[in-house]
Amino acid sequence: MKRIVAVTLLLALFVTVGFPATVDTISVFSKKMAKEIKTVVIKPQSYDRKNTFPVLYLLHGHSGRYDSWVKDAPHIKDLADDYGMMIVCPDGGSDSWYWDSPVDSTFRYETFVSRELIAWIDRQYKTIPSREGRAITGLSMGGHGGLYLAFRNQDIFGACGSMSGGVDIRPFPNNWNMAARIGAQPEHPANWENYTVMNQLHLLTPNTLRIIIDCGTEDFFFQVNKRLHEELLYRNIPHDFISRPGAHNWVYWNNAVKYQMLFFHDFFEMAKKK
């Protein structure tokens, strides 16, 4: 009798606790760049083959890697469990800025993330294969990427965000190897206008995308984020803007990602009801 009770309790514990989020490290081939690209995929503990799940594409910053988020902010696995969403973290190269480079045909990261990667993930995993089931955000270079890719691919993403994002590249012509990707500013001034988030705002219409922007007041990107917020207000584009004391570091991003994931969870839940 005692043995039966013990087994019953163990089974109850197994069912109640379940398994935590799982982390897959995969390689996705990019035809446009003719290479394999490492990507982390986090599946929530509720993941199974019977249901479909929303996906957050979470981008790393300059000099980062596909595993930066899961190593430096490991609690995102718990957030994936809490909200029942998948998280996909692709390798964006150390300095791609998630552009299709106009001066280097070997860099096609906009196409990779917004087309090739998403198509691959939708084939291999039980995703919600529509813009209502996709969001994208990131930190620093990845914050630029999150907004830039979503603004330009609104048929793919339904929500987007940025944490400490480089949302206007023009004040920083000599930084982060951007000149290697879009040409030096004096020789290619049009590229610096065309490849910045600030000049994609004409693509937006009210209530098409859910948008969240977050930047610390001690961050060197704070002023350009504040300016983006003001431009969105001027254009009557609804968005959430968060600023609080903080710098350009993982202490800030570990906190910011919690608010971003709650924001995207709310978006996914509202989309289910439509």
Q: What residue ranges belong to the model's regions?
A:
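Non-catalytic cap/lid and distal C-terminal segments of serine-dependent acyl enzymes
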Residues: 20-274
